[in-house]
């Protein structure tokens, strides 16, 4: 799949065909920042892996005022347009660790082997919380507006992602995961099932 100007025009810039909106991303940023605040996680560094057009950047930085933001993006077009760091979450390397890592709607584009390597890398890069989402087989069938979503062959079930993430992360709900070593008491009904 070509993540070029035509792709982003169709799925992000054209309001009639866009997969999301700025208002949805502002709400998502409120959710993310509210979760890290609730669990008492100070956030100094954010990695947005697959940041796309950067719709989370401003609303997150408005709420997490002491944080710096690193946008990692695979698309040459977006890196040239927005100045993101070019790379893939599967192979991205840095000495920095991030308090908050975001990887949303990225891994469904990778093969299972690539996605496993990406999840291992997310675990290496994250020292606090992960906000994670991927289009699953169940979402394609039951939830998404297929006229506004690109067709991705080989979608995996949600159980695949939960199983792969579980070795390094604990789910706390609403797409939020915390590293297993983070000292956090999760009450039984507060935690994701």
Task: List PLM regions with ranges.
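Class I (Rossmann-like) S-adenosyl-L-methionine-dependent methyltransferase catalytic domain
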Residues: 1-96, 110-117, 121-124, 128-193
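A conserved beta-strand element that flanks and buttresses the S-adenosyl-L-methionine
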Residues: 102
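Short catalytic micro-motifs in class I SAM-dependent methyltransferases
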Residues: 105-109
């Amino acid at each position: 799949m070509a993540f070029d100007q035509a792709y982003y025009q169709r799925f992000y810039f054209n309001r009639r065909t866009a997969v999301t909106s700025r208002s949805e991303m502002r709400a998502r940023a409120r959710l993310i920042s509210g979760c890290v605040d609730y669990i008492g996680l100070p956030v100094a560094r954010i990695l947005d892996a697959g940041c796309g057009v950067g719709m989370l950047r401003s609303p997150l930085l408005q709420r997490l005022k002491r944080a710096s933001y690193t946008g990692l993006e695979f698309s040459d077009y977006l890196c040239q347009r927005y100045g993101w760091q070019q790379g893939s979450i599967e192979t991205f390397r840095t000495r920095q660790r991030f308090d908050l890592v975001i990887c949303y709607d990225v891994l469904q584009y990778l093969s299972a082997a690539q996605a496993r390597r990406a999840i291992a890398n997310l675990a290496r890069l994250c020292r606090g919380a992960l906000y994670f989402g991927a289009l699953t087989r169940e979402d394609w069938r039951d939830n998404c507006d297929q006229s506004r979503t690109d067709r991705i062959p080989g979608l995996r079930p949600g159980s695949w992602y939960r199983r792969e993430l579980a070795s390094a992360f604990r789910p706390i709900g609403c797409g939020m995961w915390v590293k297993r070593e983070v000292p956090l008491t999760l009450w039984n009904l507060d935690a994701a099932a």
